[in-house]
């Protein structure tokens, strides 16, 4: 009896000591290291010292995150449309593991499914800057939330820098920004040569509903920088539906087809789109209908490769002015410098739809 009591007392004392030791260690342990990053909405975001994974709500930013980090290993989740773009892009070649990134934490409308996000348990999440309700909810859940503004090339550059801070890749981020800035500086040197030249009328078209890139889109900047004029520059909004009659009145010299839908130049050349008459449009008659390229992401939207997109448009509009570079060489240089990857001829054909 005495031995049994002594053993029980000893076990109890050991348990109490263990609990007290645990409490003491909790009280004296140093707080987890944090970093503070300011997003493009001006919010201070507290991040863990090491960001092990991120979830990305806005469609284009997953490709930007890959470019900044040089890897997709930390991209735990992305938008379903970003995954659809991935399947047709160079990311599938450069980052096959990105195919495993989750998409069920975010809806097509960018609504965030908090339960699914919780399963991912990311170190941080990237959202659109206008998602104020979601940001408030994520803050309550203590999920570090980075809000990024989007719409212009400058927005992309600011976002690149923020993501560089998130990943601890500030120097690489600056190299990407300089890459963009150097190409844009090249276009500044071409303004004098474009003076007095006729500006081709360009229609930027998206899907069978005849949505066009209106004056509020980055596509207007792309076209104008390349020496053209967006026929829809006075149309309000972003991607705005118009009528076939309006397109006939514009009678564009060049048509660029978006990568957000499957329509191909042949669909216009062969008049395959029901209820639409393309055969009398100048761009169709003269064979100047082109499918926009897709590299890391669809070049239609602001992205890491936007300056290359402008170079592509420029050679379609003014090959005499912009004959001092080979876009294929520029592409090869970009992929070799940032991803240590040599583009094959097949890769180039895929990117440029040739």
Where in this protein do the model-derived segments appear?
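Alpha-helical, coiled-coil/dimerization segments enriched in small aliphatic residues
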Residues: 213-239
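Bacterial signal peptide processing site
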Residues: 24-27
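Short helix-initiation/N-cap motifs at beta->coil->alpha
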Residues: 40-42, 101-114, 235-244
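Proline-aspartate-enriched helix->loop->beta-strand connector
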Residues: 106, 113-127, 143, 243-260
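C-terminal motif of bacterial Sec signal peptides marking the signal peptidase cleavage site
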Residues: 18-22
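A short, structured surface patch at a secondary-structure boundary
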Residues: 62-116, 124
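Extracytoplasmic substrate-binding proteins
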Residues: 34, 44, 134-211, 232-234, ...
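Bacterial N-terminal signal peptides that target proteins for export
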Residues: 1-11
């Amino acid at each position: 009896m005495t031995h049994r009591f002594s053993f029980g007392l000893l076990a109890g004392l050991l348990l109490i000591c263990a609990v007290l030791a645990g409490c003491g260690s909790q009280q004296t342990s140093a707080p987890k290291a944090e970093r503070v990053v300011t997003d493009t909405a001006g919010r201070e975001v507290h991040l863990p010292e090491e960001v092990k994974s991120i979830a990305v709500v806005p469609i284009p930013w997953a490709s930007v995150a890959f470019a900044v980090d040089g890897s997709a290993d930390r991209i735990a989740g992305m938008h379903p449309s970003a995954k659809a773009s991935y399947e047709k892009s160079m990311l599938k070649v450069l980052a096959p593991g990105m195919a495993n990134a989750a998409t069920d934490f975010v809806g097509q409308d960018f609504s965030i499914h908090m339960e699914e996000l919780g399963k991912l348990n990311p170190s941080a999440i990237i959202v659109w800057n206008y998602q104020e309700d979601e940001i408030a909810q994520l803050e309550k859940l203590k999920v570090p939330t980075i809000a990024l503004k989007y719409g212009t090339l400058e927005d992309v550059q600011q976002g690149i820098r923020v993501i560089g801070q998130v990943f601890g890749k500030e120097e690489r981020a600056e190299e990407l920004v300089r890459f963009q800035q150097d190409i844009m500086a090249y276009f500044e040197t071409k303004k004098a040569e474009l003076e007095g030249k006729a500006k081709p009328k360009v229609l930027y078209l998206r899907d069978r509903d005849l949505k066009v890139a209106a004056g509020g889109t980055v596509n207007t900047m792309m076209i104008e920088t390349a020496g053209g004029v967006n026929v829809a520059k006075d149309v309000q909004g972003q991607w705005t539906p118009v009528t076939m009659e309006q397109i006939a009145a514009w009678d564009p010299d060049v048509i660029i087809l978006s990568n957000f839908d499957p329509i191909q130049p042949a669909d216009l050349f062969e008049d395959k789109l029901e209820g639409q008459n393309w055969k009398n449009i100048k761009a169709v008659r003269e064979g100047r209908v082109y499918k926009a390229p897709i590299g890391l992401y669809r070049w239609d939207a602001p992205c890491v490769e936007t300056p290359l997109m402008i170079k592509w448009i420029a050679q379609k509009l003014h090959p005499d002015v912009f004959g001092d570079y080979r876009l294929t060489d520029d592409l090869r240089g970009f992929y070799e410098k940032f991803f240590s990857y040599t583009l094959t001829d097949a890769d180039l054909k895929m990117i440029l739809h040739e």
